[in-house]
């Protein structure tokens, strides 16, 4: 994970710690 490509919006938000 960690990519914005093909990732659900909540997925990369959790990666940011939000």
Swiss-Prot record:
Its EC number is 1.2.1.31. It is an enzyme of class 1 (oxidoreductase). Optimum pH is 9-10. Belongs to the aldehyde dehydrogenase family. It comes from Acanthopagrus schlegelii (Black porgy). GO terms for molecular function: aldehyde dehydrogenase (NAD+) activity; L-aminoadipate-semialdehyde dehydrogenase activity. It catalyses: (S)-2-amino-6-oxohexanoate + NADP(+) + H2O = L-2-aminoadipate + NADPH + 2 H(+); (S)-2-amino-6-oxohexanoate + NAD(+) + H2O = L-2-aminoadipate + NADH + 2 H(+). One of its GO terms (biological process) is aldehyde metabolic process. Homotetramer. Keywords: NAD, Oxidoreductase. The keyword Glycoprotein does not apply. This is Alpha-aminoadipic semialdehyde dehydrogenase.
């Amino acid at each position: 994970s960690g990519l914005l490509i093909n990732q659900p919006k909540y997925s990369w938000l959790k990666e940011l710690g939000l």
